[in-house]
Amino acid sequence: MWLLPALLLLCLSGCLSLKGPGSVTGTAGDSLTVWCQYESMYKGYNKYWCRGQYDTSCESIVETKGEEKVERNGRVSIRDHPEALAFTVTMQNLNEDDAGSYWCKIQTVWVLDSWSRDPSDLVRVYVSPAITTPRRTTHPATPPIFLVVNPGRNLSTGEVLTQNSGFRLSSPHFLLVVLLKLPLLLSMLGAVFWVNRPQWAPPGR
């Protein structure tokens, strides 16, 4: 009858001596840092980060070497902070395959069996898709049209129209103006010739 209380006490002691965030969420392409808090009695022990459904069979990814320096394995690094009674795990360049169950663990025994286990705490990692922003297409502004006139020179109508880059002599608007003005010009020329015609006096006067 003493076996069940002993196992329960062992489990509770391991769970209470180490505490992680429970769950964390990162974005694909970014980095994610997990803090795992522990009691002062575990300052000198190695800490490690493993992945799996169960803490007794999870696969170790990276672990400390008893020193306060960063240990790295691929995109995952770990560092112990004894002064803060915590160790941190950083996962860089996240992708959707990194989502799953992980464990903060402290190595207290070298040979694990059914009677002994390392303190551990489950951390569920979620990875959300990267946020992409649509590219904005910009169009160049239309340059303004300037009409440069020499003050010492009078430009004819044809020259003014030619210097305006927005108006062409072959455009329909120009042809329409010419067709409308041509009869008026011909009428004016006819009137001038009529007024200036020679006056012939009848013979005998």
Swiss-Prot record:
Topology versus the membrane: Single-pass type I membrane protein
Domain of life: Eukaryota
Keyword S-adenosyl-L-methionine: no
Keyword check for Nucleus: no
Location(s) in or outside the cell: Cell membrane
Tissue expression from the record: Present on the surface of mature hematopoietic cells of the monocyte and myeloid lineages (at protein level).
Glycosylated residues in this chain: 154
Gene Ontology molecular function terms on file: transmembrane signaling receptor activity
Disulfide bridge positions per record: 36-104
Membrane side Cytoplasmic: residue ranges: 195-205
Segment forming the signal sequence: 1-17
SMART domains in UniProt: IG
Domain (Ig-like V-type): residue spans on this chain: 18-120
A GO BP entry: immune system process
Post-translational modification (record): N-glycosylated.
Transmembrane intervals: 174-194
One Gene Ontology cellular component annotation held by this UniProt entry: plasma membrane
Role summary: Probably acts as an activating receptor.
Family statement: Belongs to the CD300 family.
Identification of the protein by name: CMRF35-like molecule 2
Organism, scientific name: Homo sapiens (Human)
Underlying gene: CD300E
